[in-house]
Amino acid sequence: MEFTHFDENGNALMVDVSEKAETKREATARGSIYMSPECLKKVKEGTMAKGDVLGVARVAGIMGAKKTSELIPLCHLLNLTKLTVDFTIKEETNEIEAACTARTTGKTGVE
């Protein structure tokens, strides 16, 4: 297996994508947040003391995705063309599933 982010001496480098063709790319990441039934009820009803938890989390997720190239070493700066953050409340397992989908058209992708 060849590691593309290292040169022949093992030094880290940013991959050169200048010769690649632009393509449309899309990726979705999902994760689950587990909590007590009482907490889940408050989040669902919007009665948490801090306000709209999922609304704030959505905005924070969008902001974080826009800063990916600053947070992940050697990641190319991406021109995101669409970004969604969605939540699914699953009361039977006391969880909230978070899903973030990012789209771009470029020489490198969001995957």
Task: Provide a role label for each language-model segment.
Residues 1-54, 59-76, 82-111:
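C-terminal binding/interaction regions
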